């Protein structure tokens, strides 16, 4: 599902390329953490950002996935090449593997702080890079 699912499928099928060294960082969360948070949130209420305290880069996620799939780390293309491909994708429509919106999503970091959830709920996230398993 989503971008992570597409990354796994692409690496599995040998149709995945890193972009600009895959340096963008993302906040991630193990699904098991959601289950442990529900009772805490039901009791306390409020609005919280929940994610791992460490925000892995795409390259780190690629490495974890490749290790589990016994695949080589994907080749990384320069940003300008990906941008050209994205512009073509914009013209091709929804079936294109990449377009300008997708390029922006995978090359820009998007991270959040979980400090409030940890402090107010006494919650501790599971380390994603150490515990992620492809099922």
Each predicted region: which residue ranges?
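A short C-terminal helix-loop "cap" of Rossmann-like NAD(P)-dependent dehydrogenase/epimerase domains
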Residues: 8-19, 94-96
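A broad, structural micro-motif
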Residues: 26-29, 56, 112
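Substrate-positioning beta->alpha
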Residues: 2-6, 20-42, 49
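Hydrophobic alpha-helical segments typical of transmembrane helices
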Residues: 3-6, 84, 102, 113
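Amphipathic alpha-helical segment in the mid-to-C-terminal domain
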Residues: 31, 58, 125-126
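Amphipathic terminal alpha-helices
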Residues: 114-135
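Active-site loop of classical SDR/Rossmann-like NAD(P)-dependent oxidoreductases
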Residues: 58, 94-114
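Mid/C-terminal beta-alpha module of Rossmann-like enzyme folds, strongest
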Residues: 40-98, 133-135
């Amino acid at each position: 599902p989503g971008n992570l699912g597409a990354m796994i499928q692409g690496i599995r099928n040998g149709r995945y390329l890193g972009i600009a060294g895959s340096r963008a960082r993302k906040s991630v969360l193990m699904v098991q953490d959601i289950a442990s948070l529900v009772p805490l949130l039901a009791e306390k209420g409020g609005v919280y950002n929940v994610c791992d305290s460490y925000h892995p880069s795409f390259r780190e996620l690629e490495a974890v996935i490749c290790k589990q799939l016994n695949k080589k780390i994907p080749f990384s293309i320069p940003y300008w090449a990906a941008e050209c491909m994205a512009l073509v994708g914009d013209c091709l429509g929804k079936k294109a593997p990449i377009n300008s919106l997708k390029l922006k999503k995978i090359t820009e970091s998007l991270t959040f702080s979980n400090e409030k959830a940890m402090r107010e709920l006494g919650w501790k996230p599971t380390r994603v890079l150490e515990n992620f398993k492809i099922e």
